[in-house]
């Protein structure tokens, strides 16, 4: 068995980028920054073009191919949409490969070699000032972390990001509902190191963990609360779901008990093929990813409840997508075909509700009503015995396919990192 020190020694090596990679990301960043600055200046826009986020603080992971450049507007009469229009017009003239993305407002994603550079307009705000868009906080976040994140903590941030990525909870988008890069860095600043974050996380309790850098009177109702130091009315951990928080708690406990490099090496576990599954597969809609994930998680949750009402036992379910061609709902079930009859439990015989139960079923084609113990029961015919028919009844006609027992994704695989 490897010791904690031995595992950490090897793990730190995984998050140190090569000199060539560091040089390349600097070159691409500066190249795009100069271009954007030139376009903004020529457009007569009063703004500062700068790099924030992990790229600016050196907390990015090896292999990361995304860079964030911000256009910080001093003039609030200028709309982010105007900035995007000026940038995309010039990018088109130059023959560059760009795409329009959406958060609270549009921004531009520019493809440079094998890097994706997001160019995000935002407004300049002062500490404590109410932001107009979520991106407005980014310069303040950068200032706070740059002043507090020590040089020897940069590797700890990278290691924590890799740990979170491996266990599937890195990213604040709706797809993941996990820990943002900013939140990850805040945790290292607060607790001091990667291992101290894990020691603390192993003792966290949902809805009882409150981390703050500043005094605030704001009340938050989230599994995890980390008060944003640049905006005390905001919970920097608001995106973290109960499942994501609990996954980190479990991973931290197990890693501290049995350290292993598996927590830093994302991989797929082997599939358990004996279980039954059903997939509802849709073509990917032309909408922003957060919209798509939110929409299909809602559809998936409603269908999950419906399947249970129909008598299908669902072990687990999820939404999966390549964000290009498909989005699908996946259900791991006990069985995809049910027996034609089911036992239906009624009220106790001494309860007034038993009369309505008897009157409902006494003339129906059921077995019973009969009594077992103190309750009335019937054995009645199911409306749907095939899971596909049950799904069609709920979703109606639509542009989707139903696939039964063809799935071999993560929902039917062994958890590869857990020791």
From Swiss-Prot:
CDD domains assigned: NT_2-5OAS_ClassI-CCAase (cd05400)
Repeat as UniProt keyword: no
Binding, Mg(2+): 66, 68, 118
Protein keywords: ATP-binding, Magnesium, Metal-binding, Nucleotide-binding, Nucleotidyltransferase, RNA repair, RNA-binding, Transferase, tRNA processing
Positions bound to CTP: 54, 57, 141, 161, 170
Required cofactor names: Mg(2+)
Annotated EC: 2.7.7.72
GO MF annotation: an example: magnesium ion binding
Listed Pfam families: CAA_C (PF21133), NTP_transf_2 (PF01909), tRNA_NucTransf2 (PF09249)
Residues that, per the record, bind ATP: 54, 57, 141, 161, 170
Catalytic reaction equation(s): a tRNA precursor + 2 CTP + ATP = a tRNA with a 3' CCA end + 3 diphosphate; a tRNA with a 3' CCA end + 2 CTP + ATP = a tRNA with a 3' CCACCA end + 3 diphosphate
GO biological process: RNA repair; tRNA 3'-terminal CCA addition
UniProt KW Metal-binding keyword: yes
Family annotation (HAMAP family): CCA_arch
Biological role stated in the UniProt entry: Catalyzes the addition and repair of the essential 3'-terminal CCA sequence in tRNAs without using a nucleic acid template. Adds these three nucleotides in the order of C, C, and A to the tRNA nucleotide-73, using CTP and ATP as substrates and producing inorganic pyrophosphate. tRNA 3'-terminal CCA addition is required both for tRNA processing and repair. Also involved in tRNA surveillance by mediating tandem CCA addition to generate a CCACCA at the 3' terminus of unstable tRNAs. While stable tRNAs receive only 3'-terminal CCA, unstable tRNAs are marked with CCACCA and rapidly degraded.
Additional remark text: A single active site specifically recognizes both ATP and CTP and is responsible for their addition.
Summary of subunit composition and partner proteins: Homodimer.
Annotated family: Belongs to the tRNA nucleotidyltransferase/poly(A) polymerase family. Archaeal CCA-adding enzyme subfamily.
Protein's recorded name: CCA-adding enzyme
Organism: Pyrobaculum aerophilum (strain ATCC 51768 / DSM 7523 / JCM 9630 / CIP 104966 / NBRC 100827 / IM2)
């Amino acid at each position: 068995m490897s010791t904690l020190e031995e595992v950490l020694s090897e793990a730190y090596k995984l998050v140190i980028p090569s000199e060539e990679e560091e040089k390349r990301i600097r070159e691409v960043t500066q190249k795009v920054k100069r271009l954007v600055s030139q376009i903004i200046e020529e457009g007569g826009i009063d703004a500062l073009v700068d790099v924030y986020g992990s790229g600016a603080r050196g907390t990015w992971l090896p292999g990361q191919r995304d860079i964030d450049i911000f256009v910080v507007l001093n003039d609030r009469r200028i709309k982010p949409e105007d900035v995007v229009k000026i940038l995309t017009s010039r990018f088109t003239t130059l023959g560059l490969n760009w795409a329009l993305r959406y958060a609270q407002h549009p921004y531009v994603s520019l493809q440079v070699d094998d890097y994706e550079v997001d160019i995000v307009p935002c407004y300049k705000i002062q500490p404590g000032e109410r932001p107009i868009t979520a991106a407005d906080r980014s310069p303040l976040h950068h200032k706070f972390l740059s002043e507090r994140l020590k040089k020897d903590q940069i590797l700890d941030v990278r290691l924590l990001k890799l740990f979170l990525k491996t266990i599937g909870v890195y990213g604040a988008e709706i797809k993941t509902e996990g820990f943002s890069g900013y939140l990850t860095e805040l945790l290292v600043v607060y607790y001091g190191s990667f291992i101290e974050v894990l020691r603390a996380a192993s003792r966290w309790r949902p809805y009882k963990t409150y981390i703050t850098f500043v005094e605030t009177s704001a009340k938050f109702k989230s599994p995890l609360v980390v008060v944003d130091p640049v905006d005390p009315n905001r919970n920097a951990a608001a995106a973290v779901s109960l499942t994501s928080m609990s996954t980190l708690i479990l991973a931290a406990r197990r890693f501290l008990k049995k350290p292993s490099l598996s927590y830093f090496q994302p991989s797929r576990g082997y599939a358990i093929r004996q279980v039954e599954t059903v997939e509802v597969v849709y073509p990917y809609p032309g909408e922003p990813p957060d919209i798509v994930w939110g929409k299909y998680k809602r559809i998936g949750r409603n269908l999950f409840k419906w399947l249970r009402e129909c008598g299908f036992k669902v072990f687990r379910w999820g939404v999966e997508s390549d964000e290009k061609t498909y989005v699908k709902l996946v259900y791991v079930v006990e069985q995809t075909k049910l027996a034609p009859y089911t036992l239906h439990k009624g009220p106790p015989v001494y309860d007034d509700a038993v009369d309505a139960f008897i009157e409902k079923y006494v003339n129906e084609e059921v077995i019973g009503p009969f009594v077992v113990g103190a309750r009335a029961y019937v054995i009645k015919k199911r409306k749907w015995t095939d899971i596909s028919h049950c799904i069609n009844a709920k979703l109606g006609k639509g542009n989707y396919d139903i696939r039964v027992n063809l799935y071999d994704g993560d929902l039917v695989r062994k958890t590869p990192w857990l020791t």
